[in-house]
């Protein structure tokens, strides 16, 4: 394993117009302050205020959106980062680990990774993801790309269909089909930051949001050594060259993760588990008293001095005393949150330090809060109660099904652009309106300029004479549609679907 020196990981250079020369501690901190400004002021962050956390299209402002959730994750991430640095300082390891002049950037990278961790999520969350992937699977049949004979291939797109005697081209077609059928919020976040928004963040800051290290076009089993890290797609074929460069800049082995990403992940796990339960009480899905009984029953074994007693029972008893003249709900969640943080944050920090050689190396194949401890059990308790009593609630399920239908319907509406021939679509891109394609012209006009420019730039880098040109052009055209629809807020997607389906 490599010697632990965070100066080799906290890389303050950028992909474009990077600062040159040796920098002082203050100058490096200013570079990361610039990252903070770029992130906080980006439209992608603002759009989170109208994207779902648990309850789609929620009008109650007290219920969390992706933005308020991300701000809470940011605060917990900062807390964990400070706890880690404080413990390393006590152990007199800051200088040995190259962190004595990088504590500010360390905290900032964690905070901004937390704030950005959901920016790639489509409308209606996981149901939006499922709708996109199901829609493309029904047309591209990625599983058929492995079939023999090739005549069994049911792919509906000529440019992506496998052909005899074209093995190198077929390999590209397989990759493209697999990639397009594995839309994922984390991978879309990388695409947003680099390709669509062109934020030109430091290498270290982008490393912080590369949560999963599996390429979206991956086929077959993942290696056991990286099974957790490769649990989901982390980036698309379109960003593969950028990720390759990122790995070099951050000294990451293939399929390995940037060290500070584990902190962001732990902060997210801690935040959403309590928040989902609080939102459910706000929505009157159950009362605080009912929630306490759900938690009590699900914990199972009750022993004096257990973590459940210290965290949940303590919050329940204090909320019933009503010593602060606040509602029982407010008091219960205040104490539950404080108790949970006070137990889980130090534990996550210690897990980070105890496993630092593997974490620094990028190969620690677990989450910080995923082990056999009672701390991990407490998080699982919150998650299981939410799954059983919140996510399965009829109101929540109905909204999720509506969200799935909205995203599927929007893809159906924009399908004429994907049915156009390469020559016809190229003409439409150049002229923006083509008289013999009235529907397609109007649909194309609705696409955002940012997404259209990303398509044009990607295709302009291809050689029209190359045999793979039709395949890759179609790939970027599909990305254009996925980018546009996944970038919508819940409310915009809902309204757009109703308008275009003429139901208003």
Curated annotation (Swiss-Prot):
Q: Name one GO biological process term.
A: dGTP catabolic process
The reaction(s) annotated as catalysed by this protein in its Swiss-Prot or TrEMBL entry are:
dGTP + H2O = 2'-deoxyguanosine + triphosphate + H(+)
Q: Which residues form a coiled coil?
A: none
**EC top class, as a word:** hydrolase
Cite the Pfam families for this sequence.
HD, HD_assoc
Q: What SMART domains does this protein map onto? A: HDc
Cofactor(s) essential for the protein: Mg(2+)
Q: Could you confirm whether the keyword Disulfide bond appears in this record?
A: no
**Partners and quaternary state?**
Homotetramer.
Q: Which family does it belong to?
A: Belongs to the dGTPase family. Type 1 subfamily.
Q: What does this protein do?
A: dGTPase preferentially hydrolyzes dGTP over the other canonical NTPs.
Q: What is this protein called?
A: Deoxyguanosinetriphosphate triphosphohydrolase
Which species is this record about? Citrobacter koseri (strain ATCC BAA-895 / CDC 4225-83 / SGSC4696)
């Amino acid at each position: 394993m490599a010697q632990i020196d965070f100066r080799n990981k906290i890389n303050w250079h950028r992909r474009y117009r990077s600062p040159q020369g040796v920098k002082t501690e203050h100058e490096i901190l200013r570079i990361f302050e610039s990252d903070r400004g770029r992130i906080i002021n980006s439209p992608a962050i603002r759009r989170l205020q109208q994207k779902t956390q648990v309850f789609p299209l929620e009008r109650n402002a007290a219920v969390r959106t992706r933005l308020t959730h991300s701000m809470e994750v940011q605060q917990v991430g900062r807390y964990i980062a400070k706890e880690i640095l404080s413990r390393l300082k006590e152990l007199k390891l800051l200088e040995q680990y190259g962190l004595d002049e990088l504590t500010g950037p360390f905290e900032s990278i964690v905070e901004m990774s937390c704030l950005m961790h959901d920016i790639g999520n489509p409308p209606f969350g996981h149901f939006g993801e499922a709708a996109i992937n199901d829609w493309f699977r029904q047309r591209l049949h990625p599983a058929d790309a492995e079939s023999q004979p090739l005549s069994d291939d049911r792919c509906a797109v000529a440019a992506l269909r496998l052909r005899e005697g074209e093995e190198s081209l077929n390999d590209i077609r397989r990759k493209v089909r697999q990639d397009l059928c594995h839309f994922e919020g984390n991978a879309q976040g990388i695409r947003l930051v680099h390709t669509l928004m062109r934020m030109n963040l430091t290498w270290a800051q982008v490393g912080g949001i590369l949560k999963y290290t599996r390429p979206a076009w991956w086929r077959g089993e993942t290696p056991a050594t990286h099974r957790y890290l490769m649990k989901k797609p982390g980036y698309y074929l379109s960003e593969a060259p950028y990720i390759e460069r990122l790995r070099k800049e951050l000294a990451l082995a293939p399929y390995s993760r940037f060290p500070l990403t584990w902190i962001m992940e732990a902060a997210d796990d801690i935040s959403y588990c309590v928040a989902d339960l609080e939102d459910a009480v706000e929505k009157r899905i159950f009362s605080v008293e009912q929630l306490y009984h759900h938690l009590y029953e699900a914990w199972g074994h009750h022993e004096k001095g257990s973590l459940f007693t210290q965290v949940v029972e303590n919050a329940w008893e204090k909320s019933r005393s009503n010593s602060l003249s606040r509602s029982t709900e407010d008091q219960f969640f205040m104490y539950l949150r404080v108790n949970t943080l006070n137990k889980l944050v130090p534990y996550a920090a210690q897990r980070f330090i105890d496993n630092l050689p593997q974490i620094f190396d990028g190969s620690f194949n677990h989450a910080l809060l995923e082990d056999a401890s009672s701390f991990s059990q407490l998080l699982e308790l919150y998650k299981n109660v939410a799954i059983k009593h919140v996510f399965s609630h009829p109101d929540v399920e109905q909204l999720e099904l509506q969200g799935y239908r909205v995203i599927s319907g929007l893809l159906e509406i924009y399908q004429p652009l994907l049915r156009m021939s390469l020559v016809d679509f190229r003409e439409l891109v150049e002229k923006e309106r083509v008289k013999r394609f009235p529907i397609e012209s109007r649909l194309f006009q609705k696409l955002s300029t940012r997404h259209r420019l990303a398509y044009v730039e990607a295709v302009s880098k291809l050689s029209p004479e190359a045999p793979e040109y039709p395949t890759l052009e179609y790939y970027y055209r599909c990305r254009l549609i996925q980018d546009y629809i996944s970038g919508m807020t819940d409310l915009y997607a809902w309204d757009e679907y109703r308008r275009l389906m003429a139901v208003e």
